[in-house]
Amino acid sequence: MIGAAIVAIPVVGVAVLGAEAMLAARGPDLTQGEPYDLDDIVGADKDGRTEHMVWLGDSTVAGVGASEPDTALPRVYAAGRGHPVDLTVLAVSGARVSDVVDDQLPRFPEGDVDTVLISIGANDAVHLTRAGDFERRYRQVLDALPAGADVVMLGVPDIGSVPRFAQPLRYLAGVRGGTIDAVIDDLADAPGRTYVDIAGETGPAFRRDPGTLFASDDYHPSDAGYELWVSAVAEAVEASDDRS
């Protein structure tokens, strides 16, 4: 019975994910309205060399779910760096990895960039991007980044915890998210790259306390949820620095 259920997932999954994804759009849509402009010099009053930081990705980077720009993931992470950060955020809500290649990389700033952070894959998981296609396009992103920049690759969050998705979408989306996440983890196994296990480090907390950690759309993280993401990123980067 278990084997039959596993075999049935790809067959049923396409129809269920498509139908349930449309049903999930019934709730409040926090992506409407003018997106946040997150570009800024963060911590300008701090001592030290300015770090040039670029973020690529989807709505989680664009600040959807955050109550204001300063509580968005890139701003909060930059504020905790302990030195000035020249922050550029190219992310767009709804983006898949192909959008990063086609629309965000062409806008990548010229000049020296110290750190690039990427959070992409959740939309690819829900919209059934093939793992091989995702890997190919993600490699294109990595190959286009400036030599010498530190690359921080955020994994796919625990989509199976999203309250807005009814079952069986939660389960199926979680499986798909894990597949895409494994690709990111593998690609991060190279010098100068750091993988952040967002699902593993934050997923259990989101499942325990969805009312606090999800925003009002029951889909994106809230301010408190993004704080957990920031902690996961900071800890992974610190651990990577200790190993190098």
Residue ranges and their predicted role:
Residues 1-54, 234, 238-244:
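N-terminal secretory targeting modules
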Residues 52-54, 62-137:
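Conserved SGNH/GDSL esterase-like catalytic core that processes O-acyl groups on lipids
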Residues 89-91, 155, 197-200:
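Residue-level recognition of beta-strand->loop/alpha-helix junctions
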Residues 136, 140-144, 179-186:
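Alpha-helical scaffolding segments of alpha/beta enzyme cores, especially the outer helices
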Residues 147-150:
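A short helix->loop->beta-strand "cap" motif at the edges of active sites that frequently abuts
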Residues 160-244:
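Catalytic His-Asp segment of secreted/periplasmic serine-dependent ester chemistry enzymes
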